[in-house]
Amino acid sequence: MAYIRLLRRYTVKHLSHWKLWKFTFVIFIFLIFVFLLQREVGIQDFNEEPGSPSKDGKINNVLGLVLKAVNNIKVAKPKMQIKAPIRQTQKAGQKRCLPGSYTAAELTPHLDRPPQDSNAPGASGKPFKTVNLSPAEKKEKEHGDEKHCFNAFASDRISLHRDLGPDTRPPECIEQKFKRCPPLPTTSVIIVFHNEAWSTLLRTVHSVMYTSPAILLKEIILVDDASVDEYLQDKLDDYVKQFQIVKVVRQKERKGLITARLLGASIATGETLTFLDAHCECFYGWLEPLLARIAENNTRVVSPDISSIDLNTFEFMKPSPYGQNHNRGNFDWGLSFGWESLPEHEGKRRKDETYPIKTPTFAGGLFSISKDYFYKVGSYDEEMEIWGGENIEMSFRVWQCGGQLEIIPCSVVGHVFRSKSPHTFPKGTQVITRNQVRLAEVWMDEYKYIFYRRNTEATKIVKQKTFGDLSKRYELKQQLQCKNFTWYLSNVYPEAYVPDLNPPLYGFIKNVGRRTCLDAGENNNGGKPLIMYTCHGLGGNQYFEYSAHHEIRHNIQKELCLHALAGEAQLHDCDYKGKNSRTPPEEKWELREDQSLYNAALKMCLTGNKEHPSLVPCNPSDVFQKWIFGRNN
């Protein structure tokens, strides 16, 4: 109590002091005011001139000075009262978002899948086996196989609504949360088709609606690239009318995948574009992981982990809950796309299955991209025709111009991989080579000559300059300040083996005695003997390079080397792969002055006197041991 009384006495004392000080201050200000007022108005009237301020105006000036002085003193006083905070206004174009993560209820699919019959054909992604067929059924199956290059008979008997069984992705994928800030962008799914089977096309559409959150799926755009099948006309239009988000747009003449996708993108209203082929099935939770990566950085171009749907049984190869050995995209020097295992450093970087895979190239059939970035980075090369090479072109362009390509393992989409295309090319398959020349000219710098040596058709197009106008693509490259191809090989794909830019010898290898050429034979991916075949000068199976490391390389798709064995010579994977590798003696060849190909490890020479070239004791007078390198046509 004594403490409280003391505190009260102290407070009263200081308050009285404050009141006294305040009264003194007011008197002081008043005296200043009177002094200034007297000084201003006490001036003789004869000093006034026309246009000078009146007495009232002078008095107002003095009052203004006094008030400013008082206000300055007030501002200098400590502020004891706390004001309310000023609400920050939202920036224009900035989307509102709530904290935390999306709930399962928020990510409810656009459409509920109907009840499933576990015994139905192909249920839960199981295979459908076509056995004990009647003559009519066999005829139907054969027709479908020929028309679509997959078992349309099986597909037609599997429900358009089939589910794929339990979610077998790794636990970290199933439990993955997606932040509300920044919000996941909406997407327009674009599906191009040309004479597609009814069941595969509509199963793709239904699959998207059954697995894509309603708040993210803006629309599904079906782009018809001049199909002639009657069931893809009015019947399709009538069928999709039941779904407000499904649109059908048509090209009256066959222009190909590239033009059709550009048409779909031009009418899309989603913030992102998701391209799918017309024979896919989407697994659970496929869309959110793709869009989450774009939400974080809109220069990412992201692909799902593509699973296989068997072309004969339509079995869906489901992901493993324990993770799996993933692949990434690559390219060969014939500019074809391929798959390869992840390098060790990429495997170490990824802690679990939620981590993306950085990929040098992508397949190009299934991917998502920000719509704004799609156009900023150059969409597609509009002068490329039909199909082919556009995925390699976009891969090089995205990386070299500041973007990234990723494969997202938690996003799984099944795809029917066909062994051959059922479609014809209106201008022939040379349009693919023309497309490849366009990408090589713009993005590969001096490395384009590696491709030209392997493709005589490409060399012809370059000489005749029939690849079209490239000025817009060069302008884009300059505008985006894109890096060169050396940078790409050093920073994006350092694992790539780069052949000699100027090999000592290249072309076909002709045997003097038989007047036939060394030929890799069909489907020789290594481990098979070579053959002797009529020289055609078109490259391909008869293209070889004599490298600076004294190898004889056949490197159109894989890097294969002529391997010396007792008996028939074979092509094997080349041991020399660049840095930290060497050329083994069995792969070193000496082209001697007598035109023989000599292997020092076996101390033998290559002969072409039989169907398969082989190694025999050297004989300088044997014409079957003499070889000539020649340039392809």
Regions found by a protein language model. Give the residues of each.
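N-terminal signal-anchor transmembrane helix specifying type II single-pass membrane topology
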Residues: 2-75
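Cell-envelope/extracellular polymer assembly enzymes that use nucleotide-activated donors
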Residues: 185-190, 219, 393
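Acidic donor-binding segment of Leloir-type glycosyltransferases
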Residues: 209-250
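Lectin-like carbohydrate-binding module/patch detector with strong preference for beta-trefoil
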Residues: 495-633
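A recurrent flexible, glycine/aromatic-enriched loop bordering the glycosyltransferase active site
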Residues: 258, 333-368, 376
